[in-house]
Design a protein with these regions (language model features):
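Short coil-to-beta microelement around the adenine-binding A-loop and adjacent beta1/P-loop entry
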Residues: 14-15, 106, 214
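ABC-family P-loop ATPase nucleotide-binding domains
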Residues: 98, 105, 110-197
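Walker B catalytic motif
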Residues: 200-204, 211
């Protein structure tokens, strides 16, 4: 689904990613752990297309899958950006897209979701308005008609109920006045409505208490633990991985993946730290 090869990126004149290589297949959950300044958040920003992060080398190929409502996530992309890529698993007819050639909104429409460490507030824009516009923009990109208000509200209510979130919160401005836990819960509702193929979650456990962590972990599992989806979890701590069991754990240090293992590697990092393993 995602193939990152020898990725190099800078912020300003400072190299941050220095030859990072990583592959995710459908149905897999990968966790990236590492010390501060290793490049974890930079990786998420580069994949999401955030301005100010310059890719200076390498490639990122992405094979999206069709959405739950149907439609082709690559329907409106130029043919020059879509090609078959034998490195990526999936249907023989799936097209791989050069992710780095897409604008941020095109990456989202192709099936990528980026969860933020600190979800932003958007005064004056209600959650319902924001999410309906986002979902219908994706549907347009896939060559589908927009959802009516009633059709959208049915999906939104189902996702809010699944997260134990009062639907009235979706009528409020996006994240305005929300606690840290409410913002992360709201982000899970957003992810459930958007229904991405690939979720990149940057320290989504930051600032959560045990109860909120369990709710968020359950949300990730419910929405994303499926054979046609994949997750890249970026975290400092083992505790989120108690609820979202990874298939692979990677150590990111000095801009590169320096070690890969199973879930037991996270326990080793929690016990011993990064000093020996990051070398």
């Amino acid at each position: 689904m995602l193939s990152i090869e020898n990725l190099h990126a800078t912020v300003g004149d400072k190299p941050i990613l220095k030859g990072l290589t990583l592959s995710l297949n459908p149905g897999e959950i990968h966790a990236i752990m590492g010390p501060n300044g290793a490049g974890k958040s930079t990786l998420s920003y580069v994949l999401g297309g955030r301005p100010g992060y310059e890719v200076t080398g390498g490639s990122v190929m992405f094979t999206p899958r069709h959405s739950r409502e149907g439609g082709n996530p690559l329907a409106t992309l130029p043919d020059t950006l879509v090609r078959m890529d034998p490195r990526l698993r999936g249907d023989d007819e799936s097209g791989a897209v050069d992710l780095l050639a897409l604008a941020p909104h095109e990456r989202a429409a192709a099936g990528l979701f980026l969860g933020f460490q600190y979800p932003v507030e958007i005064p004056g824009v209600s959650n319902v308005q924001f999410l309906r516009e986002a979902l219908n923009a994706q549907r347009k990109h896939r060559g589908q008609p927009p959802l009516s208000g009633g059709e959208f509200l049915k999906i939104a209510r189902a996702q809010a109920d699944a997260m134990g979130m009062d639907f009235d919160m979706l009528k409020r401005p996006v994240n305005v006045g929300f606690s840290g836990g409410e913002k992360k819960r709201n982000e899970m509702v957003q992810m459930g409505i958007i229904d991405p193929a690939l979720a990149i979650l940057d320290e989504t456990d930051s600032g959560l208490d045990i109860d909120a962590l369990r709710v968020v972990g359950d949300g990730i599992n419910r929405i994303m633990r499926k054979p046609d989806k994949a997750v890249l979890l970026i975290t400092h701590y083992q505790r989120l991985l108690d609820y979202v069991k990874p298939d692979f754990v990677h150590v990111l240090a000095d801009g590169r993946i320096t070690r890969t293992g199973g879930a037991e590697l996270a326990l080793e990092l929690e016990r011993d730290g990064y000093k020996e393993l990051a070398a």
